[in-house]
């Protein structure tokens, strides 16, 4: 969230540390819209973003730069909102991509929308069931930002803020032409009717409800890394999804890094690991050998 395609300039050093950098074409996408990060999901408010990517942009890119044009040569990767995007695109288009690397993703399970269970009776974004204020961010174990305070700032900024970005993707369009708010801004009370609409964007729910169809197509393609102390409390959804994978003996790589936070999971070693995964899938030769084997 908040970055665009120019971030590739600052990531170049991380990329060039890979043994396979000269054999991999990296495309940095810009998911920023007037409403915020559209996460390449088709939505009532942002329009057919996923459809445009799959039907227009990728074919154009592959034809223009002779990139092969086959699903097994396409891989997804992203961090934070970009991590959610990578998972969303892979799960909804399992035959179009060869694998996804998902780092510190936005909530993959809306039972764990950070620290709030959106499906719970009387769910509230500001206070929990015991009346304690709900935190949105922390440093280590210490909460440093409350949800209510963040929402107050987000609403002042209007379109393009994080909360509004979620609603622009997940919510229906209201009679006023704007995304329907998921919760009451004064009280924090969650609107269950809106959450019922949101469920079609709940990635864990999509996988579980379509398990027989999706599991063989996604096997070996899912790689998720999060920090056990994610700054924005995003790791519980990752842990819940991994628990489901383990119960079903599903082939996925999910790693929750001890002492890791939101930013520290995105590192050069992960880029190298991701590239080795791609190299193994495509049987690429290691002709650079920048790292010791």
PLM feature spans:
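Non-catalytic cap/lid and distal C-terminal segments of serine-dependent acyl enzymes
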Residues: 1-293
């Amino acid at each position: 969230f908040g970055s665009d395609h120019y971030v590739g300039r600052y990531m170049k050093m991380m990329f060039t540390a890979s043994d396979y950098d000269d054999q991999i074409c990296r495309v940095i996408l810009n998911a920023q819209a007037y409403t915020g990060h559209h996460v390449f999901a088709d939505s009532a408010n942002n329009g057919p973003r996923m459809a445009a990517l799959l039907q227009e942009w990728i074919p154009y890119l592959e034809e223009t730069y002779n990139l092969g044009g086959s699903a097994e040569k396409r891989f997804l990767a992203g961090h934070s909102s970009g991590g959610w995007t990578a998972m969303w695109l892979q799960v909804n288009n399992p035959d179009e991509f060869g694998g996804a690397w998902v780092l510190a993703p936005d909530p993959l399970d809306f039972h764990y929308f950070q620290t709030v269970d959106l499906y719970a009776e009387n769910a509230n974004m500001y206070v929990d069931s015991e009346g304690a204020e709900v935190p949105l961010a922390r440093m280590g174990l210490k909460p440093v930002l409350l949800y209510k305070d963040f929402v107050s700032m987000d609403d002042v900024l209007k379109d393009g803020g994080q909360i509004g970005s979620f609603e622009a993707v997940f919510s229906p369009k209201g009679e006023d032409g704007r995304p329907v708010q998921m919760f009451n801004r004064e009280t924090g009370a969650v609107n269950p009717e809106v959450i019922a609409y949101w469920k079609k964007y709940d990635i864990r729910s999509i996988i579980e409800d379509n398990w027989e169809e999706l599991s063989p197509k996604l096997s070996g393609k899912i790689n998720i890394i999060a920090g056990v102390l994610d700054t924005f409390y995003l790791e519980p959804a990752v842990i819940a999804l991994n628990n489901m994978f383990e119960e079903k003996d599903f082939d996925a790589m999910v790693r929750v890094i001890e002492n890791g936070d939101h930013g520290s999971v995105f590192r050069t070693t992960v880029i190298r690991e991701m590239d080795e995964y791609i190299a193994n899938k495509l049987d690429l030769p290691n002709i650079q050998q920048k790292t010791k084997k």
